Amino acid sequence: MRRGLFLLWLWMIAASGAIDALAQAPTPLKSGSDFQPAEMRRLQADDFANPGMLWVSQGEQLWRSPRGDIRKSCADCHGDAGQAMVGVAARYPRWQSPSGRVMNLEGQINFCVAGQQKSPPLAYESEELLALTAYVAFQSRGVPMSVKRDDADRPIYDQGQRLYTQRMGQLNLACTHCHQANWGRNLLTDTISQGHGTGYPGYRFEWQKIGSLQRRLRACYFGVRAEMPDYGSPDLLALELYLAVRASGLALEVPGVRK
């Protein structure tokens, strides 16, 4: 019965064609944690209880650990992450001239792993990459998102915006149907958020571990019964860039805690 009501609710959203063009940021901007139950917000705010902090601690160890043939650590180049990495995650994804492409934070970490440490890149959703990304992003907790658009990455941003408003999957839904037109409404036991990625990498109880924003985006593809893009695919990177710009001014809150 609940499944039938859920599908009916989604069908009613999909039948409303007037909201396809809504791609601008919602007003006022609200963090994903604002839509979580009080106990989740308390858990996220408590560094001793937040389960995502286990990965942050692991990332701190990896930051200092030599890697690759030349046995170089992240700290050898950047020093103390508590100083060198403040504000860095708030500026990603971004266009990187040396590589000639848009990189998210995971991509930048792997660029350094391969180029500076002469070590094989870390796999998406691997414990090491999640931990390092969480640790670097944690240094920017409380820093407002400030991803800039320029001419080089404008086509990627435009691609992300198109994907955000594009109906897809068997349910014929777009991101905007939930996170722009219906945020704040109840969907079964959850409250629909504005869809910002400022808490990722974040701990989700349904995963029982920390996960990346791309994992969460892929879950949305699965939810509307669409083909899921591969990790690191151009579509997911474009969506990440668009969402980061859309969240401009919202503070990072890594590691977020979600149901």
Question: Where are each of the predicted segments found?
Answer:
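C-terminal cap of thioredoxin/glutaredoxin-like
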Residues: 162, 169, 177-183, 199-205, ...
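Post-cleavage N-terminal segment of exported redox proteins
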Residues: 2-5, 9-56, 83, 93-158, ...
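N-terminal, post-signal-peptide region of Sec/Tat-exported proteins
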Residues: 47-80
